[in-house]
Design a protein with these regions (language model features):
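Metzincin-family zinc-dependent endopeptidase catalytic domain
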Residues: 1-83, 87, 111-112, 122-125, ...
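Conserved catalytic/binding loops enriched for acidic/polar residues
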Residues: 92-451
Length: 451
């Protein structure tokens, strides 16, 4: 059998790789790598949001061949790793600090990830001016974990092979550069093993990505004046900003809430099998998510950007009315159990909900009416509590025709204290609909007589 690298005339935008193996021995007999026709589409869509602020080559629809080749090199490194028997290692990108990833000397020597088998491509922790200093901006070489893994798999051993391999592995016990990160199970999320993450500081990562997206919102309309640029690319461009915010920004950082570091058990290892993310870190992440997503007015500040996608009055309202970021935060609530159980000083579900409520009602506690973004977040919060609580589900079924609506707006002189504990009797009507992009102005709740 022969190894092949094929040009694929399809609409895929990712390099593919698979091996033909002997099922009896596991021996790799052949490797097949496919390079898609539309690789440039992926570079154009993904690279611009993370790199345009840092690298001027991304500030155009017409991506230079040089940039495409750099991207292809990065993707082929992983493909070659797969052909040699290496598995996807989602922890590689979490091994280094933001300071290391902004160092020209460090990145030129070690690259931007400890393993190219991760799914990271770009060094989005870099800042404007770092490229000129020599900071590496894209995966360009195998990481230290890759080198060790190839040694482990293929190096000849003159002594007892099993003992030698165990010795080699234990020499790197506890070193994050050599940690192999599998995809986390749903009930135990390891924040080191996330798609699209980079660096070991989630706060710095979030700040960097938001700064890059803000730059794109402010400047991108000037990049697309050419009439030859396809309309569908122009029209979908703002939508990809939302995808960037939700999938590549909010999802990785929220995994620290209820997160737990999982290390495979080894009787000789000094690393615990389970190590919950500290309560302090979880609190910091929650506060950072609220402070970042509380005010998304910058998404609406450039009308030319909004008009790329047609007649859009704003984008922030769409995000809020579709439940972000609260939907992601309540998703994490259901996955805090193992972290709480294994921690000596846990960040409990009750403490988490209390902290969320402090953020939700910060305006009210300061004597101000709830803003439209907070009303939208409150709606998702109440709806989630009702869906998770059997008691509230029963109440909802019994009194579905007697749900009372209260308008929460600046004209209503309300006192939220009269609602009592929202975690006990709040609900959002399952049939309530918000029209178009209009800000949410009301939320339904149970009155005392309902309970």
């Amino acid at each position: 059998m022969i190894n092949t690298i094929a040009f694929l005339n399809n609409n895929n935008s990712e390099v593919t790789a698979y091996n033909v193996t002997d099922l009896r021995t596991g021996e790799i007999l052949s490797s097949k790598i496919g390079v898609p026709r539309d690789l440039a589409v992926s570079v154009r869509r993904n690279g611009v949001y993370q790199m345009a602020e840092i690298d001027p080559r991304f500030r155009t629809y017409y991506i230079a061949d040089e940039v495409i080749c750099e991207n292809l090199t990065a993707r082929m490194l992983k493909a070659f790793g797969l052909s040699l028997g290496l598995a996807t290692n989602l922890a590689g990108s979490a091994a280094y600090s933001p300071e290391e990833l902004r160092s020209p000397e460090f990145t030129q020597k070690y690259g931007i990830t400890a393993s190219v088998m991760d799914n990271v491509l770009y060094n989005y922790l870099a800042q404007p001016g770092d490229k000129e200093k020599g900071v590496v901006l894209i995966v360009d070489k195998p990481g230290v974990c890759d080198a060790f893994t190839l040694k482990y798999l293929y190096a000849a051993t003159s002594e007892n092979e099993s003992d030698t391999l165990k010795k080699w592995a234990m020499e790197h016990d506890g070193d994050p550069r050599y940690f192999y990160g599998k995809r986390s199970p749903a009930y135990a999320t390891d924040p080191r093993c996330q798609n699209y993450d980079l660096g070991n500081d989630p706060i710095a990562s979030l700040d960097a990505q938001i700064a890059h997206v803000k730059y794109v919102v402010k400047n991108s309309p000037a990049w697309f004046h050419d009439d030859n640029i396809p309309n569908d690319y122009r029209e979908l461009f703002p939508d990809f900003v939302i995808i960037e915010l939700i999938n590549k920004t909010l999802s990785p950082v929220s995994s620290y809430i209820g997160g737990i570091y999982i290390n495979e058990a080894n009787e000789k290892s000094n690393v615990p099998s389970y190590q919950p993310v500290s309560a302090d870190m979880q609190k910091k992440v929650l506060q950072k998510i609220f402070s970042t997503f509380y005010d998304l007015s910058w998404l609406d500040s450039n009308k030319d950007f909004l008009r790329l996608g047609g007649v859009n009055p704003d984008m922030s309202t769409w995000i809020y009315n579709n439940g972000y970021p609260m939907m992601s935060l309540m998703f994490r609530l259901m996955r805090m159990g193992l972290s709480v159980e294994k921690s000596t000083r846990p960040y409990t579900q009750e403490a988490y909900l209390n902290d969320i409520e402090k953020q939700l009602f910060k305006e009210t506690l300061n004597g101000k009416p709830l803003s439209a973004p907070m009303i939208a977040q409150l709606s998702v919060y109440i709806s989630s509590l009702k869906g998770m609580c059997p008691t509230l589900k029963a109440i909802d079924k019994a009194v579905s025709t007697r749900v009372t609506s209260i308008a929460l707006n600046e004209q209503t002189n309300h006192k939220l204290q009269s609602l009592g504990l929202l975690t006990t009797f709040a609900s959002i009507s399952a049939t309530e609909k918000q029209s178009g992009m209009e800000p949410m102005t009301s939320v339904n709740f149970y009155s005392g007589t309902d309970i």
